[in-house]
A protein has these predicted regions:
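Cleavable N-terminal signal peptides of Sec/SRP-targeted secreted and luminal proteins
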Residues: 2-18
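Beta-strand-centric surfaces of beta-sandwich/beta-rich domains
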Residues: 18-380
């Protein structure tokens, strides 16, 4: 009887500890919901800020999923029709206590500069699965990997555009320079004459054109993000995070110079689909166990191919069809994901892997994105 009472008390203490920490437990998987710092917006306003030392699970863990959405001060979801999420990223870094300098502890590649996030999406956030299947997990918090005297921390970069009252909401989302009345980039350097839209025109603090009679009302929004994880154990198979950018200019040089964005010209030949491709030599051997593409409006999908032309992973854009939150017409509200059967999507070390990104070319699109995020379990 005593041992039953002792077991009950242990379970009760465990439950109370989880409750006090804001944790939920489901089959050993821990879950916690966090809020980003406040993001203040006005109609047409752009916020593109980085937030350091955000809340994130502590300890040596395996992340199983990372989901989020934009909410207002009441905690209610915010529509893409009002606040467009151009992109968000979550990046790991190491920092010494009391020192501003930091070391970016990014993913496994492929770009030499940038694209170092562990997690990231855009408007497709709400309907894109991020769950890492068993027995795999994204390993973080390993004390043996943290430099002596440093602490592992995490940062958010959130690029949000308030399109309430916008003259051309889609044009604002594509960062058309004429709508932002911008001729210089954020570093006060003049834009090149042929640059008509993209990140250089919708940087933090810029404002897209709104209707003259529209009342400017301030709004505070937040990113509500939910992390699921398990404590690390030998039964978990670690996976590496890779991000393939279709603008990668690699040409057997070993240098992955990613341009980050590109334009899709309106077709003059009757071909309705624009295809952009890039090939790289893959640095390791392993199995693709999960993946999805990231694109902007106009995107159709993307696919990752092996050297022999086999499909390693493919992802299609999911468009909204109405006005409800999560179903906004004309917006990519989700991307399909791939979960290859174990062993069916193997990559050999130094194999040439090709990414193809597909966009509609019925009209012009500026500053588009062509990323493929995928997880690889390395071969032993």
């Amino acid at each position: 009887m005593d041992h039953i009472l002792l077991l009950f008390l242990m379970l009760l203490v465990s439950y109370v500890q989880c409750y006090e920490a804001g944790l939920n437990l489901e089959n050993g998987v821990k879950l916690k919901v966090y809020l980003s710092p406040k993001i203040t917006l006005f109609p047409g306003y752009v916020s593109n800020k980085s937030y350091y030392d955000i809340e994130f699970p502590k300890g040596h863990i395996a992340v199983k999923s990372f989901n989020d959405e934009v909410v207002d001060e009441a905690g209610d979801p915010v529509s893409l029709l009002e606040t467009y999420i151009h992109h968000w990223t979550v990046t790991r870094y190491y920092q010494r206590n009391g020192v501003k300098d930091l070391i970016i502890a990014g993913n496994s590649g492929l770009c030499n500069h940038g694209r170092s996030q562990f997690f990231g999406m855009g408007s497709e956030t709400r309907k894109t699965s991020t769950y890492v299947p068993d027995p795999y997990g994204i390993e973080v918090g390993d004390p043996s990997k943290v430099p002596v005297g440093y602490e592992e921390k995490w940062m958010f970069n959130i690029h949000a555009i308030d399109t309430r009252g916008a003259v051309d909401a889609m044009g604002c989302n594509e960062c058309r320079c004429n709508l932002y009345n911008v001729t210089q980039d954020k570093d006060v350097q003049p834009l090149k004459p042929y640059y008509v839209g993209g990140l250089y025109c919708c940087y933090d603090g810029t404002q897209c054109k709104v209707k003259n009679a529209f009342k400017s009302v301030k709004r505070n929004v937040y990113f509500k993000y939910t992390v699921k994880w398990v404590d690390w154990s030998d039964s978990i198979v670690p996976v590496k995070v890779f991000i393939f950018d279709v603008t990668d200019t690699w040409q057997h040089t070993g240098i992955h110079n990613c341009l980050f964005e590109y334009d899709v010209e309106k077709s003059t030949t009757g071909v309705a689909t624009n295809t952009r491709r890039s090939s790289v030599s893959f640095p390791t051997a392993g199995d693709v166990i999960y993946g999805f593409a990231q694109q902007y409006s106009g995107g159709i999908g993307a696919a990752l191919y092996g050297e022999d032309g086999r499909v390693l992973c493919a992802s299609k854009a999911i468009y909204g069809k109405g006005k409800d939150i999560g179903d906004e017409a004309g917006y990519i509200v989700g991307m399909t994901t791939c979960y290859p059967k174990p062993g069916s999507a193997k990559i050999v070390k130094d194999e040439t892997v090709t990414l193809e990104s597909y966009y509609s070319s019925k009209k012009m699109h500026t500053g588009v994105l062509g990323l493929f995020y995928f997880l690889v379990a390395e071969s032993s």
